[in-house]
Structure formats: C-alpha cells, structure tokens
Amino acid sequence: MSDHSTFADRHIGLDSQAVATMLAVIGVDSLDDLAVKAVPAGILDTLTDTGAAPGLDSLPPAASEAEALAELRALADANTVAVSMIGQGYYDTHTPPVLLRNIIENPAWYTAYTPYQPEISQGRLEALLNFQTLVTDLTGLEIANASMLDEGTAAAEAMTLMHRAARGPVKRVVVDADVFTQTAAVLATRAKPLGIEIVTADLRAGLPDGEFFGAIAQLPGASGRITDWSALVQQAHDRGALVAVGADLLALTLIAPPGEIGADVAFGTTQRFGVPMGFGGPHAGYLAVHAKHARQLPGRLVGVSVDSDGTPAYRLALQTREQHIRRDKATSNICTAQVLLAVLAAMYASYHGAGGLTAIARRVHAHAEAIAGALGDALVHDKYFDTVLARVPGRADEVLARAKANGINLWRVDADHVSVACDEATTDTHVAVVLDAFGVAAAAPAHADIATRTSEFLTHPAFTQYRTETSMMRYLRALADKDIALDRSMIPLGSCTMKLNAAAEMESITWPEFGRQHPFAPASDTAGLRQLVADLQSWLVLITGYDAVSLQPNAGSQGEYAGLLAIHEYHASRGEPHRDICLIPSSAHGTNAASAALAGMRVVVVDCHDNGDVDLDDLRAKVGEHAERLSALMITYPSTHGVYEHDIAEICAAVHDAGGQVYVDGANLNALVGLARPGKFGGDVSHLNLHKTFCIPHGGGGPGVGPVAVRAHLAPFLPGHPFAPELPKGYPVSSAPYGSASILPITWAYIRMMGAEGLRAASLTAITSANYIARRLDEYYPVLYTGENGMVAHECILDLRGITKLTGITVDDVAKRLADYGFHAPTMSFPVAGTLMVEPTESESLAEVDAFCEAMIGIRAEIDKVGAGEWPVDDNPLRGAPHTAQCLLASDWDHPYTREQAAYPLGTAFRPKVWPAVRRIDGAYGDRNLVCSCPPVEAFA
C-alpha cells in the first residue's frame, strides 16, 4: 500500500503512512495486531507458510487490471453470440447509447444507495416514479412498486399478495398451463413451504371445480398465444377469487391491458425495455395492483409528499409494510430490488415515448406475422404478438439445427413443436433464415388482429419531453445532480459496505458476448460464461470455507431464502420435516425473520445482552425448549452490533447438538475475508452479498447477487432449474439458472485482481478505519458496542440516545444535517433505535474519513449549543436541515443562526458543497395522501 502499483493499492484508500496514523490512534502496533485483538482467537485463521490466509492461498495470484481484462476478454470470446429467437420471457433489445453511457456506465447512478435519505436522493426517486408510471400506464392498474427481482419472483409475490388480500382459509391457487415454465417453477418453490396448493389447468376453459383464492395467467402465454382473459376474471370474481396476469409490457402497447379487463394484479419484467438479456439478468421485474391493495405490495414504493417549505418532494412510502420494520409479519422478505435496471427501463420508455414503443411493437408483430404467414397450416395459434408456435411432427431437432447452422437459436417445445420469438433486434434477414430452417417459402403475412387497446398511455411530460439525445443527456445529468452517490462522497452506511466499484471491474458487463446471451441458450454458446461461473464458485468456496456455492439467488434476501429451503429439505430427507423452529437473535435484520417465515418456519427470538452479544443462556434454554422441532439458528457474524462475538463457536455447537443447522448471515463478510471462514467456525450455510463485500455496485437499490454457500451435506438441496440439468435438484428461487449472471464478471474481476493478500488487506483496512472512527468520535458520541478488547469490527454504532434525552436533537436531525456538510448519513436506528451505524469500508482515504469525523464533531458542537440554550430545540441548524439554496436566498430569514452557518458550517473550503434539492420531507403527509405515479413533481406545486 505504498506506490499504488497494484490494483489492491488503488482499491484500498489508505497507504502505509495513513494506516500507521490510524493504528496509532487506535493504540495497536500493526494490522496483524489489530486482527488478534479484534477477532476471537478460536476462529482467526493462522497464515500458511506462504504468508496467505488458509483457503485464499489457493486463489490465483493477483492480476493487474490489464491482465484481468484480457482474461475476461478470453472468456467472452469463448461465448458465441447467436441471434436469439428463443423468447420465453427473454428478448434481445437495443440499449440506446445515451442511456448506456449516462446510466449504466455512470457512477453517479450505479454507486448510489437505496434512497432512505430522500432529500439527497430526489433524482433517482423521480426516475423510479417514472418507472412506476410506466408500469401503471401500460398495465391499466393504479399502483406499481419500484421494481421486483425478476418475473418469476414477481409472480410468486403476486400469488402471496392475492392470498393475503383474500383473507380467507382457502390455500389453493390455479395456474394456467401456458405460464412460462420457469415462472411456474418459482411459484412452486414459493407455494410449498407456505402450504399453498397449486392446481395447473388450461384456463381458457374457465376455473376448475373447487375453491381458489386466486388464478394466474400469462399474456401472451409461453406458447405465444394471446387469450382474452376477461371471462376468466369475471368468473373468478364471482367465485371470490382474485386474478393475476403476467403481462408483456411491449405487447400492452397494442392489446388491452390487465387492468382494463378487470384483473387485480399484473406482474412481469421490463427486460425488453433496453435491458440486455445478460444470460438471465439482472432485469427489473414489476408488480402492479389496484389502489385498494397498495398496502399489500412488497418491496419499495415511491410516493409524493411535501417538504418543510411545502415544496413537493419524493420519498419511499408505506415503509411499515417492509421487512426491516415488520420482520416475520412483513409482506415479503425482499429489500430494494433492481433500481438501476428500473431506471434504465423507465428512461428507455421516456426516450421512445408512447409512439416509439408502439412502433417497435408493431414491427415486432409484423415480423411474427411474416413467419406465421409462411408457416400456413403448421401454425398452432392464430392470435399472437411476437411468438409463433409451429407444428413440425418429428422435425423439431432438424429445424433447430438448420437455424443454428445459420446463427439463430429457436425454442424446442417438444419433438413436434418449435416456437420462434421476434423482438426489437429481429430483421428481415433473420425472418428469411427462420423460414429456410422450416423449409417453407415466404408468403403473404398472416394478419393476427390483436390491436384491442384503446386507452392512451405515457402522456405525462416525463415521457414526451426527452426524445432527443441532448435533452435526455441533460435530464439524466439534472437528476444525478440531485443525489449523493460514491462519486461525490463517502457513504458511511453501516451494514451496507459502500466500497469502491472499480471501473476495471465494471468494464466487461456491457460487452455483447455477456449481455446478448439468452439464459436458455445452448450450453455450447455460453462456454465462457459457464467457466466464469465455475471460477467464481470455486473462489467463493475457498474464501468462505464451505463446500458448494449457488449463484442463482439474485439478492441477499433470496440467498437467505434459498439457504433456509436447503435446511428444510435436508431435515425432510432425514425424516424430520417437522423441524420448523428458526432461532433469531433480537438484534437481527428484519430480512432474516421475513425469510424464515417465507420458508415456512416459525421464528423464536433469542435475547441479547446489553453489550449486544447473544445471551448464551437464553439461547441454550430455547434450544432445549424446542430441541425436537429446531430447524436452524440464523446469526449474523460479525454481529449486527458491529463486533466479533467471542461465543460464536459455542453458539454453533449448542444448535448442532440439538440437531439444528447454523445459518451464518454473510452481510458482514467484509470483516471476515482472509481472517475467518464461516464454513470452518460452525456455519452450515451462508448467503453472501456480492453487492457489498465483492464490489457489485448498489445501483441506487439494486441489482445485487446473493449467492448461497453450504457445507457438503446441504449441497444436494441448492437451487435447481427446469432448464439447467447440470444444477442440483433443489427448488429454483429465480427465473434464470444463474440469476443475475451478467454482473458476475464484476466480482470475478475484483477477486482476480485483489488476490489473497489484497483481499485480506481489504478486510484489515476496513476494520482499521472503523476502529479509527470509533476512537475519534467516542468522546462526542459514545460507541455503543465493542468486543472484549475494546475493538469493533468493520463498523461502529454511535449512541445518540443520551443526547436526544438531554437536548431533543434526534438521529434524524443529525442525518439531515450531514447533507449540509456534504455527507450521506450513516444507517439510522439500526439495529438500535436512536443510534447511527457507521461503516467506512476499506476504499476511503484518511482525508475523507477525517472529513467525516470533522463533520460529526462540528454537528456535536451545534448540538451543544442547543443543549446550552443558545438555539431553541425547534429552530436550529439541525432541526432546519437540510438547507436548500432556495431557502437560503429567501428574502426573509428569521432564524437564530445565520445563512452561512446553515450552508457552510465548517467554512467554504471544507469540501465541495452539496445542495439538497428539497428540505426535510414530511413522511406522514405522503402516506396519508398516497400519490405514486407521475405527473412530475412540478405539477404538484
């Protein structure tokens, strides 16, 4: 860490002199000395003879950026970029270069976090409101959330939403036989642990006999067939059931939307709106409902409120539905889903407008009609949008081979049927190759009269004003300027690990060799991607000490869910399906409890001591009480209190002795890599957050990847997939076999360039920075928890409860005031109300960490003035924060502090000024007056 000659030196923000400065403040002699004092001796790995950490010593030596990119290029070149006409929910598309450059390749967008601090997140909140408007307009429903993980999980959430909304004892749902196979598989995964019975039927004939809480159909179906589901909706409603329709948004520019035929829920994906297939992801799924079901929606929901000056402003609405508050009673276990991809899809719609989208849809449909016309009597359905199904008795393999020989992949339904899907990238030449593969001549196009939509859509200015590249470029810049992302400032969010997302790591994700791969393409087309997946799995095994890894979960929440399902299936395989108790410490993140509930488990809370550690006596008592039914313990390590618990080995042993499994939540793995391996100190399963520890950017709230790592006895129960026989036989949790595969090169590049030494140094540096902050700020804000030697892990919790009691100043006041100092706030009131959890990561420099500390010290001085009575508690720079340029330029200024104190509390030279777009937002107003779609914010003035 001296001459910045290696990637690790550039990734890690501290050079050797800065490390020495921090260690002196902490009071330790070296990084290794810090590790010995912070990490329990019983789990701390001893370096091997090679000087590397066990496991990591088998990683390949660190590569330079150029070397890693050359290796990635070789992997990319091992793929074949065929023309995909497979369809089945994944379609080729053209990403407008202005969106590629200004969103996907722009750190102002991809390095942002979930917009929990709305005053400094107005840009992406507006973009997400555009996304919600896109979905509601096209589906004909009233409320949509801010994205789902993919279409399959959106379908699963639609199913459970209908079950909640039905509020009855019935636990049966009927699914149309023409729903996408992968969607049906994810539905089956979700239904089983919840005791929901799925009945599969051809719903064109109406509902089967019996009681159902809901029905699920597809529009168009997997076969390409378009069905008018209005009669089904009426029949279902007459029998007290709800209806969810998986709808193709591009098709909905032409055909009547689900909301207009009376459907209660619509779900699907926005992938074909400019988002590459990416071997399965990431893509932004969607979920839309009638307004009466708004509180049943899972995930994030952006709404409009007002700030303290009455200015309209955006915020996350109805957060009391979510897992971080309601825990096992939440509507879902998902956090934010696919924000970056939702923004891309929304801006694709904005760039094309209603007319442009309709033109694309008509062109796609025209190509399908051309193929249908040539197929003649071989055509199975006469109502279709983009996909035609052909009857070819005994010739399916021959047709596929002929098309493949000319660079096109079709979809084999069975030995007698082939389907062909057209998309935005389809050309007349492609159509000619397809016809040749079928052995038919071109003919007059068929005319499938499908244009049944009469309602307008996307009439809001957000979808009419940005049709030129100049206007779109400036719009995206204007939105980004309203936000704080890592390109402007350290984001010290505890439990979030907002580290550098290096350009070299990001570069390859836009390569067509990765982006234009269909997840169900022939394996021979994706040899390079499959090798990359295998590399990454093997490296994560070495890093974690487990035996097998699945990369399918496309979020940490889904990794949790997959791990718990593996535990459940393991117990069932041993004749113990009754084991359904999941022990969870009171300090745990709410996602743990929500995931356990989704996996069909009953949550029993384990107490924690005042110092934050798990109460071992209470754990043993509850293990004993529930020994016969004990399934698992979920525990985060290091703990959510930011310390290494010294009893972790005893905790794991107590659970194992009773026949339970130990789930070690990997959210804080950034404090373990190269130091300790959960698979070796007692864990049976962990999920990892590649978007935290392993450098996939947060994207403003997604994408993420949440691999699940297990010991050998759980490996057979890892997620499988109906179209991936090479995977284990477990239940799929995502639509695609390898989840969000196209962003895996980011983590591959990070590990490849860091090497064993760099990975360990990253962990040690993150711990160093956190302990340095704890030492510097402890006299101003007491550090709530430390380990046995007075050390924290990679984050620390600052306790403001005493300050609040004495002065009335709250964590919310401090968080908002930090924006005036140019910083994003730490995590508020988690895991303890009235506290701030700070995580600096290894990527920040000493200067940036010191600036944050100076800001916090400056804020404490302001708090003291309130406490001394110099400023009233209801009128001071903290309570008035954040301050916009508009409020400072107002002719009237009747506050006891000056405008200069408001805007530049440490002077104009402190750091570049961040101007919040709005003042403090009234959350309660937004929930009482729920508005979750456009027009843009100015229209509410």
Swiss-Prot record:
GO biological process, one term: glycine decarboxylation via glycine cleavage system
First-tier enzyme category under EC: oxidoreductase
Keyword Nucleotide-binding: no
EC number: 1.4.4.2
A Pfam family this chain is assigned to: GcvP2_C
Coiled-coil ranges from the UniProt annotation: none
InterPro entries: GcvP, GDC-P_C, GDC-P_N, GDC_P, PyrdxlP-dep_Trfase, PyrdxlP-dep_Trfase_major, PyrdxlP-dep_Trfase_small
Xref: CDD domains: GDC-P
Keywords: Oxidoreductase, Pyridoxal phosphate
GO terms for MF: glycine binding; glycine dehydrogenase (decarboxylating) activity; pyridoxal phosphate binding
Modification N6-(pyridoxal phosphate)lysine occurs at: 692
Catalysed reaction equations from the record: N(6)-[(R)-lipoyl]-L-lysyl-[glycine-cleavage complex H protein] + glycine + H(+) = N(6)-[(R)-S(8)-aminomethyldihydrolipoyl]-L-lysyl-[glycine-cleavage complex H protein] + CO2
GO cellular component annotations of the record: cytosol; glycine cleavage complex
Cofactor list: pyridoxal 5'-phosphate
Superkingdom classification of source: Bacteria
This protein's record includes keyword tRNA processing: no
SUPFAM superfamilies with a match to the protein in the record: PLP-dependent transferases
Stated role: The glycine cleavage system catalyzes the degradation of glycine. The P protein binds the alpha-amino group of glycine through its pyridoxal phosphate cofactor; CO(2) is released and the remaining methylamine moiety is then transferred to the lipoamide cofactor of the H protein.
Sequence similarity: Belongs to the GcvP family.
Oligomeric and partner information: The glycine cleavage system is composed of four proteins: P, T, L and H.
Name of the protein in its database record: Glycine dehydrogenase (decarboxylating)
